[in-house]
Amino acid sequence: MKNSKRFYLYIFIVSVLYAIQYYINNKITPVGDQTAFLKYAEEFQYNYLYFGIDRYFTWSSRLLIESATLLFSVHEKLFVVVSVLATFVLLLPSKKFSKELPWLPGFLIFICIPASEFLSAGSIPTYVNYIFPASFLLFSLYFRYSSN
């Protein structure tokens, strides 16, 4: 029981550190798609419904991702909260997938994938395009096989 609490505390701390790393990097150098989506938000007068309708008729395959990117580009603090949750969910299955070293995946993600890797498109679009889907995938696999 104590080991389990320590593991959850560990992945929570790693999740917070990772989200803060992205947030700080984003504040220092907002680049790429993120700045473009801030302009889209102004263009649509921060009306997410109009943006969604426009994207649906122009590029519907990216509607969900671009809507999330627009929302998080405007509301960065919400992005930090959701990215902590997404990173936590990304690391949660590591206890089941690598029982001997459950802390290793979190450590490797934090060390091997630094925030500077995501500077071309911006922190928020990259997180929405890659970390969120990976989190959902591992979350679904974890709960699919958790009873086994």
Regions found by a protein language model. Give the residues of each.
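Extracytoplasmic loop-helix module adjacent to an early transmembrane segment
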Residues: L17-F57, T69-L70
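Short hydrophobic/aromatic helix or loop-helix immediately within or flanking a transmembrane segment
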Residues: D54-L85
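Membrane-water interface at transmembrane helix exits
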Residues: T69, S73, K95, K99, ...
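Start-transfer (signal-anchor) and selected internal transmembrane alpha helices
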Residues: M1-Y18
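Alpha-helical transmembrane segments of polytopic membrane proteins
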Residues: K77-T87, T126-A134
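Membrane-interfacial loop-to-transmembrane alpha-helix junctions, especially the N-terminal start
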Residues: R6-L9, F97-P105, N148
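Transmembrane-helix motifs of polytopic, lipid-linked glycan transferases
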Residues: V84-W103, F139
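Membrane-interface micro-motifs in multi-pass membrane enzymes
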Residues: P102-Y145
